[in-house]
Structure formats: C-alpha cells, structure tokens
C-alpha cells in the first residue's frame, strides 16, 4: 500500500507532507518551494497553470487567474459573504443552476471543488515526484469552522483530483498533532491553537493527554469565522491605496482590473514587509493613464497605519476565542501553550493581541505555514495503521438539528460534540392523516431554523392515516469522523425508512463529480501528449544543432551529394519543428539522423586520427544526435538544459 499524504489546502497557499518513519517531511514543489500558491490560471490555449507560474502572470491575465477560491467552496451564490467577494474579485463569480457560487472563466462555468482540484493535483504530483511512485490516498485539512457543505465540497475536490480522501481533518487539530508529537512534556496539557490564514480564522482548545504511553488529542471546543483572513487584510491596504491615489490624482483605480491586480500584489508585499520593518514604500510606475499622460503611484505606508487599517479585523478574532474558552469549560489561565498557525500570525499586532488575551507569549517553535500539512501526514500514518500511539478526538463545530412546528430549530447534536457520534429522537405528525413528513436538516446556533444553514431535506412517505401526534417517526443523526452528516428517518409502525448522506441541497451531484473526474483525466492525457511533443521537439532541435555544427567543420570532406542530402534533411526537419505533429517531427528527426550517418563516421574517423578530446566532444554530439533519431531509448528523466561553451584559453 502506498503512503497516505497530508495536504493543507489553503486559501492563499497549500502544502504537502509525508511521514518517513516517524519523521515528517514537507515536500518541495517543482519550483523548489515548500508551499504552493493556491492560484490557478486558465490560458488561452487551454493550458492550466497552478501555483507560482499562475501567480507570475496574474497581472496580465486577471480575469482568468483564480485565487482564494476556498472562500467560495460549499457556498450559495446568495450568501452575503459571496456577494461581498463579487465586488472585490477580478474574476467572474456566477450563480450555478443549483444555486451555488461558481466561477466563469473563458466562457466556461467551473465549480469551486473543480478549481481546488487543480491545486490538489499539483500537491499529489509534488508527492509523487518525491516518492517516485503513484499516490492515491490523502488526508486533507479544512478550517475547523467549516460546515457540512464545505467539508463535502472539499472531499469532492479530492475525488476530482484523483485522490481517495481517507479523512477530512480540522486545521487547528492537525497543527496540535504536529506540535504535540514533537514535544516530550509529560502529563496533561491544554493548548489553544489560534489559526489565522489567508481566508479563514479558527480557534480550538485542545487537551493533550498521556494515556498509557499513547498521546490523546481531545478537542474541547472550537470556534471561528470562515470569512476572515489575510485576503481581508490585503483588501484594506488596497482600499487605502485607491483612496489616497484618488485624492492625489483624481483617478479611481477600483474600476481598472489590471491596476487592481498590481495593487493586490503590492498590498500583499507591503503587508509582509511591515511585519519586519516600520515603514515600506509602494512604488507602481505607469499604474494608469489619462488625457494628461501616464500616472505613477508612489506611497509610503507605516506599520502604525497598517495596524490602524486592520484593527477591527484583528479584534474580530477575539470574540471567538472568548466563546471557545467558555465552551471548553476552562479558564484562560488553564491554557499551557498558545500555538499560532497561518501566515497572518506573523504580524506583530496579531501576536500582541493574542498575548493580551491569553496572558502569555505564543510558542515560536511551530512553523505557521507547515504545521497543518505535517499534522495531516501524521493522521495519514495513523489511518494507514503505521502508528498506534496517537488518538485523535475531534468535535463538530456547529449544532445540527431539524426544523419542527413553527419553524423552530430542534437541536439533535450540540456544537463541540466529539465525533464520530450518533443520536436519534422520535417525532410525530402535525396534522391529522398526514401521509408524509419532510425532514429539513439545519446547521447553526440560532433558535429559529431560518437563521441557520440548511444542509438538505428529504421525505418519509407512506405514513398510515392517523390522528396528529400518533405516528412515531424516529429521526437519527450520524456524524462520521470526517464531520460529514448522515440522516435517517423511520416510521416505527410500518418500518419504512429513508436515509440520506447530507449532500448540501446544492453541492455537486454524483454525475457531475464523475464528469469532472473524467475531464481531469482527459486534461492529464492532454498534458502528457503536450510533454511528449515538447520532448520530440527538443530532440529534433538538438539534432539540428549538432549536425549543423559538425557540417560546418567536416562538410567539405563529404561528397557534394551527401552534403546536399543532409542540408535538405535539416531544412525539412526545421520546417516540421514549427508545427505540432509529433509523429512528423519524429519521422524527420530519424530521416536527418540517417542522412547524417556518413558525417558521423567522418567525424569519428577524424577524431581517431587526431585523438583530440575536442573532436570527441564533437563526434559525441553528432553520434548522439544520430542515435536519438534512430530510436535509441529515451530517458524521460533527462532534461535538456541550455548551456554556453566557455573558452578559458586566453
């Protein structure tokens, strides 16, 4: 069985880790970085860029470069958070047929899980390149405060990426795992994990206990805000720059998509710089132009100014901390360690606020970017059966219930209940001779059902006629270890029952997921063909280069007919290389290799006569070229690099 990898699918950045023995290893991607921007770009020729390459071209392709898509996952188009994002994002957020928030790119409507799957596929490939084998199983993390629809949508994204998602685990819990297994302190410890990432905020109170040599991680409570994070901090800076520029130059940059993309990049850079310096300068030449000519943007921002701009955002994280402490039934003074996770916790003001609330400095020995992926990898090792000294007890973040008479939310499972869990309760009919009941399932803390998030509904039909209040209908709730809900209803008199896994009343249908999986596979096939074409092209170009070089030096030793033949073959291959027909390129490469065989022999004979190293190099070039065309085995792992010969002899 292959390794189960751990993936932190973040709003802004993602990260993948594996376990090597009992040591976690965060894997570097193809660009050599340990985290990958969660940015996906759809190019005109159908190519999809993920990570740093997508981020690099965002300024020139803002409408088709998608970032922070995690903020839309599992959400309805009408939700106020989505409506807020519509005005801010350079790309187009649209309403899907099922009422979900989707994205439109180059005339094609895409579901957020489908877009996130591209990031997951890159993480999967990163792990495969490192391990040298196929990876099919993963543990993926989500914000602790994600509701059922958001968890389900994340699982769907994994499937579309070709992964069997063994478990969805909460980010703060994963960070606690990474922290707890690294430490040798004995006895029980209560820790607070404060996780402020790119798009979401979570706070979890977790107890780490030693039980007969086994480390038990029990989540006591969790709280948060799934629409608060670094993206909001960036937006405050962008709004400030736009306001200042309008005052100075009288031009409103908020309507200019290209300018906005440059501002986003500059805002993020300024925010990061202000964590280590007191002042930074934003310098964007040619940001826009009007009748009087081009306009340049030059603005100084101090750390104090940034802190004033985002003060209320930081303050918004404190209320959930208060609630989590209360729900956990502990006092602030009971907390042994405070762990900071997520890039935003590098901001000094955030650290200061956390210290103020918890009355102690946060630990500095946890990597805020990597701890979550490491925790996911540890959980993967536990699920794979390779580790038995860890037990994880997580909770459901929000109460679950059904709508009963008068639109009341009757709670079946309270928030912060340890999962997996089951609960059932008996209900009855509201009218005489009622033949069916509709079970509407909600998640949230409000007293009235309409104030909560509706997860789904289903009918139990065929109830025998009876006065109201007589039939006995048992409704059962079952939450699995992923935090995903399964609901059943059963008429006790007839034994009739109906069960559903709560697929959000929207969400992706099985058929849609299957289609997206097939699309993804087709894309992979397309990518493979493209790669093979590039390889053939490189081979052809290398042969043209080496043959021309040898021809320049040894051509006069050939018969005129031979030389013409080679030159004609070079010309034909050069023409074919301009096209995209791989078979034709291969055929012409082979033809040139055959035509230049005599030339290779001349080079070789000359080299033998002279016995010179330089000649050997030349011959190797022509010979290698000739062999390449003659179907010599081609090593996929060899990448042609461009190089220049340096002549050191003065």
Swiss-Prot record:
Coiled-coil residue spans: none
Keyword Nucleotide-binding: yes
Amino acid composition bias (Low complexity), ranges on this chain: 609-632
Single GO MF annotation: ATP binding
Location of the region described as Disordered in the Swiss-Prot/TrEMBL record: 609-638
CDD domains hit by this protein: ASKHA_NBD_HSP70_DnaK-like
Phosphothreonine PTM sites in chain numbering: 200
Gene3D superfamilies, per the entry: 1.20.1270.10, 3.30.420.40, Actin, Chain A, domain 4, Substrate Binding Domain Of DNAk, Chain A, domain 1
Origin: domain of life: Bacteria
Cell cycle found in the keyword field: no
Function per UniProt: Acts as a chaperone.
Family: Belongs to the heat shock protein 70 family.
Protein name: Chaperone protein DnaK
């Amino acid at each position: 069985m292959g390794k189960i990898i751990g993936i932190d699918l973040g709003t802004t950045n993602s990260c993948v880790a594996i376990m090597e023995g009992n040591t976690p290893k965060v894997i570097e991607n193809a660009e050599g970085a340990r985290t990958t921007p969660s940015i996906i770009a759809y190019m005109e020729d159908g190519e999809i860029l993920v990570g740093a390459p997508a981020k690099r071209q965002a300024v020139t392709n803002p409408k088709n470069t998608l970032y922070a898509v995690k903020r839309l996952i599992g959400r309805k188009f009408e939700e106020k958070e989505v409506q807020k994002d519509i005005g801010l994002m350079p790309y187009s957020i649209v309403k899907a047929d099922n009422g979900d928030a989707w994205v439109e790119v180059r005339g094609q409507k895409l579901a957020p899980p489908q877009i996130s799957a591209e990031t997951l596929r890159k993480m999967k490939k990163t792990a495969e390149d490192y391990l040298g084998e196929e990876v099919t199983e993963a543990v993926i993390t989500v914000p602790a405060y994600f509701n059922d629809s958001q968890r389900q949508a994340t699982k769907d994204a994994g499937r579309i990426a070709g992964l069997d998602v063994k478990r969805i685990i909460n980010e703060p819990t994963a960070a606690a795992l990474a922290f707890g297994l690294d430490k040798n302190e004995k006895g029980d410890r209560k820790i607070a994990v404060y996780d402020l990432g790119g798009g979401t905020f979570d706070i979890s109170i977790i107890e780490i206990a030693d039980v007969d040599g086994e480390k038990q991680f029990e989540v006591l409570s969790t709280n948060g805000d799934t629409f608060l994070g670094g993206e909001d901090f960036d937006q405050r800076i962008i709004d400030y720059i736009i306001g200042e520029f309008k005052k100075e130059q009288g031009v409103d940059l908020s309507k200019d998509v290209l300018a906005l993309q440059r501002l986003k990049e500059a805002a993020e850079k300024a925010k990061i710089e202000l964590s280590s310096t007191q002042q930074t300068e934003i310098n964007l030449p040619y940001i826009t132009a009007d009748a009087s000519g081009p306009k340049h943007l030059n603005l100084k921002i101090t750390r104090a100014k940034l802190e004033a701009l985002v003060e209320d955002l930081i303050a918004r994280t404190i209320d959930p901390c208060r609630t989590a402490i209360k729900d956990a039934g502990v006092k602030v003074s009971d907390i042994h360690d405070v762990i900071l996770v997520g890039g935003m916790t590098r901001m000094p003001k955030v650290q200061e606020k956390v210290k103020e609330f918890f009355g102690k400095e946060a630990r500095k020995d946890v990597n805020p970017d990597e701890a979550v992926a490491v925790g996911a990898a540890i959980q993967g090792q536990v699920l794979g059966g390779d580790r038995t000294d860890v037990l994880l007890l997580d909770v459901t973040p929000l109460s679950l219930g059904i709508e009963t008479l008068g639109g009341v939310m009757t709670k079946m499972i309270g928030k912060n209940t340890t999962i997996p869990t089951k609960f059932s309760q008996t209900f009855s009919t509201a009218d005489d001779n009622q033949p069916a009941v509709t079970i509407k399932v909600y998640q949230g803390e409000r007293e009235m059902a309409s104030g909560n998030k509706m997860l789904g509904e289903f009918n139990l039909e065929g109830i025998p006629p009876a006065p109201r209040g007589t039939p006995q209908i048992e409704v059962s709730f079952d939450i699995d270890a992923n935090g995903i809900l399964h609901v059943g209803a059963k008429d006790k008199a007839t034994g009739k029952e109906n069960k559903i896994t709560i697929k959000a009343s929207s969400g992706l249908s099985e058929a849609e997921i299957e289609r997206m999986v097939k699309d993804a596979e087709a894309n992979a096939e397309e990518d493979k063909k493209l790669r093979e074409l590039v390889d053939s092209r490189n081979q052809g170009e290398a042969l043209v280069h080496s043959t021309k070089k040898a021809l320049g030096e040894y051509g006069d030793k050939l018969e005129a007919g031979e030389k013409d033949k080679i030159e004609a073959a070079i010309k034909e291959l050069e023409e074919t290389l301009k096209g995209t027909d791989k078979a034709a390129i291969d055929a012409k490469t082979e033809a040139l290799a055959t035509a230049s065989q005599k030339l290779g022999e001349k080079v070789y004979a000359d080299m033998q006569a002279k016995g010179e190293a330089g000649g050997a190099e030349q011959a190797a070039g022509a010979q290698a070229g000739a062999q390449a065309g003659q179907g010599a085995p081609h090593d996929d792992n060899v990448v042609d690099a461009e190089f220049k010969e340096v002549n050191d002899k003065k």
